[in-house]
């Protein structure tokens, strides 16, 4: 079972960047990972934000919670639904088809400066406009940086590497379109 978090840091959202499994592009992946022990979803997301980007995070209550099927994450049908667990409510909950597993994704803020950890190749610090650009056309890491994009890179990533948005970046874009108040 996994959990993730969209962290707002000075109007930007840190996402991990690194080679995809096939080595054909640079995947853009949300902060998050597998739960450990008896962690809640929020505890996992907060720990992963710290482990991957050195961010101490504070939860932001979402305007609502959306559910979707993870198998359709590129073009999911999202619907509002209640979060019945105690504690912090997520903005998104991905349900895995034919399994009881869920992946909650939370909203958070941080005053810290993101720093990629030893397990993170790099971080892109994405503005809402940059997210829209990455989703609307093919762009390389070099083009992103030349256009003023912000990145913190630990590894030597190829500047000609095509940026590949993973589903959670598309989902964040949709959420920001529906709820621009999240940015304030």
State where each predicted segment sits.
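The catalytic Nudix box helix
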Residues: 30-81
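N-terminal strand-loop-strand
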Residues: 1-31, 42, 56-61
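Conserved aromatic-histidine-acidic binding/catalytic patches
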Residues: 3, 33, 37, 94
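Nudix hydrolase/Nudix homology domain
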Residues: 23-27, 87-184
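Short, charged/polar surface micro-motifs in flexible loops or helix N-caps
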Residues: 11-13, 22-24, 36-37, 65-68, ...
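Short acidic, gly/pro-rich beta-turn/loop elements at beta-sheet edges
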Residues: 15, 54-55, 115-118
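Conserved short secondary-structure elements within globular domains
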Residues: 84
């Amino acid at each position: 079972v996994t959990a993730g978090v969209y962290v707002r840091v000075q109007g930007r959202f840190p996402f991990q960047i690194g080679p995809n499994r096939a080595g054909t592009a640079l995947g853009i992946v949300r902060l998050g990972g597998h739960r450990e022990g008896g962690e809640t979803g929020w505890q996992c997301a907060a720990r992963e934000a710290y482990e991957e980007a050195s961010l101490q995070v504070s939860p932001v209550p979402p305007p609502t919670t959306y559910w979707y099927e993870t198998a359709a994450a590129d073009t999911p049908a999202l619907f509002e639904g209640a979060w019945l667990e105690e504690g912090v409510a997520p903005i998104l909950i991905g349900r895995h088809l034919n399994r009881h597993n869920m992946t909650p994704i939370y909203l958070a803020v941080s005053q810290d400066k993101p720093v990629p950890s030893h397990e993170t190749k790099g971080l892109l610090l994405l503005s809402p406009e940059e997210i829209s650009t990455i989703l609307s056309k093919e762009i390389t890491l070099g083009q992103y940086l030349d256009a003023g994009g912000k990145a913190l890179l630990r590894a030597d990533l190829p500047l000609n590497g095509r940026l590949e948005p993973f589903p959670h970046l598309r989902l964040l874009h949709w959420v920001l379109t529906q709820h621009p108040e999240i940015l304030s």
